[in-house]
Amino acid sequence: ASEAVYHRLLADIEAASGTRLRILPDIIAGASAGGINGIFLAQAIETGQSLEPLTALWLDNADVDELLDPDARPARALTKFWATPLVWMAARRPGDAVERTVAPDTREEVRMKLSRFIRSRWFEPPFGGEIFSTMLLDAFDAMAATPAGPSLLPDGHPLDLFVTVTDFDGHVQSLSLNSPPQVIETEHRLSIGFRGRGGSASGFADPAELVFAARATASFPGAFPPFTVRELDRVLKRRHRAWPGRDAFLARVLPRRAARGEAEDAVLIDGSVLANAPFAQAIGALKNRPSRREVDRRFVYIDPKPGHRSIHLNREGEEEAAPIGENAPLPGFFRTIFGALSDIPREQPIRDNLEAIDRHSARIRRMGRIIQALRPGIEAEVEGAIGRMLFLDRPTPARLSAWRGKAQQRAAASAGFAFPAYAHLKLSGIVEDLAARLFQLSGEDAPMMREAYRQAIWKQVRAIGADQLTEDAGSAAAPVLFFRTHDLAFRIRRLRFLARRLAETLELEADADSEAVQAMHDAIYRALALYTECEGNDFYNDHVRAAAAQVPTDAGAALEAMAQARGLRARDEAADMLLAEALANLPKAGRRTMLLAYLGFPFSDIATLPLLQGDAVDEYDPIKVDRISPEDCTAIRAGGANATLKGIEFNNFGAFFSRVYRENDYLWGRLHGVERLLDIVISAIPAPTRLPEGALRNYRRAAFLAILDEEESRLPHVADLIAGLREEIG
């Protein structure tokens, strides 16, 4: 099986480089068909269920004969009898698409389905929405019925799923301007999000909610009718199936309409109309990712047909280069309309998203260089503040707390006039995070109320004097007390910084005491978990939510409720116990390295937080972007999508007309996927210890053959292709 190839690869990487690699897909985003795949993938990762039912759904049911609405089917052979000669001429002329791309023994099947499709109802979507919703629900039920393995995420690790949807009528949003103070605009983009946690007993989401998201994001205009919640209600009613969280779900994904009692009236169409590559949601989910190891964060996006437009019209129905030159004709009437309304937005490049990721990565690289340059001076400052006894005394929780206080005072004094600027930036980040968290917990969603929350929290902060920031503030000063009570982000940054220092020093030293280093590693991440659990909205109880709803009138009570719920002082004591014990058991040199990093963090933070513009960076590694596409896969066959895929025919709807097409594209998808994933996994290892190119070729060959062995019995219609691929692979 292909799983055995991956297992062997990870074992060989560990043997060759000493790196234990684990791959965690923990952020998934998609639109349209990619949204459906993402939803099922997230369900499988979170629950440990098999994806085999989704494969069966695609191969068996993604067919025009299965998807045609019963009311749209030609009632009898004479329905639109006058269209039959047109179909016959289009499908039988020499060199037509059917003759060129379909195996001889299935051409009649494709032609018959094409005939029924063209003779179905016109000027209305031919495919049935309720049929589609039922198929999706059947697939989730089939997944639940199969034996499940364990969750594929560590216990408590978050999994974020996003799919985009287009609100056909749009929903009103207000914008704040200078003049007039407020304007109204209509927003059509929607993002439906789900969050699960590895090992959670509550499950990922109700299958009805996942069907809602899948059906809505893949409601391709013209092919399927627009989706409404009433459609799903009818499907569930026919199956006598309850949806206990219906109202809460609709209030979350359609808050404005639900507040007016109009959620059932929302008309939703394909998410790729306006947001075909939802990178923005995935980028947003990067904040507050709990990394239990050093992270090589990859954004992997899948583009099965780069350069192939979803809707392409020309006289011959075939792809052709755009005419150029002085006498080149302008796009015609229908081509202009289709391009402007659907094709161009759908194919919009992802340059803006990738540039945002690149800027994020550049800031992290710059920060790393600055920290490395500052380290000798910072270590000298720490030794000067605490003295030589730092490395002679055994660390205890009390000593660690006292040393930390001295180091922070020294950092503030050494920073001089730069410290108030840093402190104000840090204060601003805390207040904005508190305001945003309380706003989310309140259930409000109006932009004007969001601003009211900000103003109320800031007013309370000023009232208690927490904004009176100077470098010589005593331990009882209002700003210091406020930071101790509410500065969650600083604590998380410090522990991630310590984890990073451990990974780049002691964990790389062959002569380090492995048990002590592992214990230090575990202590850091257990301490980190004490704080990161406060970052999810599901951490906060009804008391905090009730206080959050009263922020505009009593911000002080809301801040007190947040402080009590988080209990950062108690968490500090627990973290100190974990770290002190682990530090005490390290060899002397290793203990010195870790103590200097931990106590020196306030110096580093003063230097780097302004560089990051106040944004906390949870993963201290640049983000890399990889693509999986037929164009990038040449190990078996060059030529990209044109040389391998069948479904790109018929304006990318070819796979709906033949199981041969679907089996072909499914098989090539697996082969292309494993080729690129092997490339990506191996590239995560530093170049000096990376496996040689010959080893990569061997892994590819083994994986290709394993996939062919797995799929041969399931894909009888492409037996000739499989035999030919065995020869090509060698």
Q: Where are the regions a protein language model picked out?
A:
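Catalytic or ion-translocation cores adjacent to nucleophile or general acid/base/metal-coordination motifs
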Residues: 51-69, 275-277, 284, 291-355, ...
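Active-site gating loop/helix substructures
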Residues: 112-123, 156-288, 332-335, 437-485, ...
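Patatin-like phospholipase
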Residues: 1-141, 175-178, 182-188
